[in-house]
């Protein structure tokens, strides 16, 4: 029987790891879309992920019908699983089934890129749409004000923390780490906007940046798609210019 020991598992590893470099695959600069796939920092981040795979540190999900094996954490077979806190925001009897004994489970922020000038962190965006002609736009404004206030209101935070202790079985160490991750994220938040582009170019970029993590050389992958990506980004920027005129 093969003894399995894995450093990293999961589906959501690629973007947090390369965003730590401080460079997303695509960014918005001066109102225009910019392709960063050839940026040296981004290329280095892609090479890092390729090296993780080449050194056998990533779970080969193809051996498990493309399903992460989170239970390996509880079994002591793997170390890290990049995900959201929702994985442990439920009753302890639920999340301990896969992650192991309550006292043995902890989370940490994605490590800082030692070559980056700052500690950049993958930030999620909470967005709300207001339909044209909505009957009560002022109500939407009040809702947004309440949501924003809830992020900083001490009483709201205290209630949330107590819920994490009482309902989710969190320790004070976990609460402190949640605060630390929030602090890091707020200092230098970074988001890749590739997913917000047209479906064709978005899929092309997303598929490409996933390749090094799966064991394919980034420079070869980039060469195969870069011209097409640049062409489509140029078309998007042209449309932006037309809308401005």
Predicted regions and their residues:
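Extracytoplasmic/periplasmic substrate-recognition and gating elements
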Residues: 96-166
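Non-transmembrane alpha-helical segments in soluble domains
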Residues: 46-54, 70, 140-148
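Extracytoplasmic/periplasmic solute-binding protein
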Residues: 1-34
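Conserved C-terminal helix/tail region of periplasmic/extracytoplasmic solute-binding proteins
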Residues: 132, 137-141, 151-245
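Short helix-initiation/N-cap motifs at beta->coil->alpha
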Residues: 61-74
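Alpha-to-beta junction loops
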Residues: 74-84
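A ligand-binding cleft/hinge motif common to bilobed small-molecule-binding domains
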Residues: 85-100
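Glycine-centered hinge/linker elements that transmit conformational signals in sensory
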Residues: 28-63
């Amino acid at each position: 029987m093969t003894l399995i020991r894995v450093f990293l598992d999961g589906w959501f590893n690629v973007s947090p790891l390369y965003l730590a470099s401080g460079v997303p695959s695509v960014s918005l600069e001066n109102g225009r879309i910019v392709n960063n796939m050839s940026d040296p920092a981004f290329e280095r981040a892609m090479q890092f992920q390729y090296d993780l795979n080449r050194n056998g540190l990533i779970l080969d999900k193809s051996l498990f019908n493309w399903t992460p094996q989170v239970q390996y954490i509880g079994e002591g077979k793997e170390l890290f699983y990049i995900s959201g806190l929702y994985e442990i925001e439920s009753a302890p009897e639920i999340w301990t089934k896969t992650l192991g004994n309550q006292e043995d489970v902890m989370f940490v922020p994605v490590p800082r890129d030692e070559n980056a000038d700052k500690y950049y962190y993958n930030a999620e965006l909470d967005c709300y749409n207001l339909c044209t002609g909505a009957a009560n736009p002022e109500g939407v404004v009040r809702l947004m004000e309440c949501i924003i206030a809830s992020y900083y209101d001490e009483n709201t935070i205290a209630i949330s923390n107590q819920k994490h202790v009482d309902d989710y079985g969190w320790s004070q160490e976990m609460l402190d780490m949640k605060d630390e991750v929030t602090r890091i994220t707020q200092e230098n938040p970074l988001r890749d906007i590739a997913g917000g582009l047209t479906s064709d170019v978005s899929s092309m970029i997303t598929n490409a940046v996933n390749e090094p993590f799966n064991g394919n050389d980034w420079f070869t992958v980039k060469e195969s798609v870069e011209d097409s990506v640049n062409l489509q980004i140029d078309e998007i920027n042209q449309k932006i210019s037309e809308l401005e005129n």
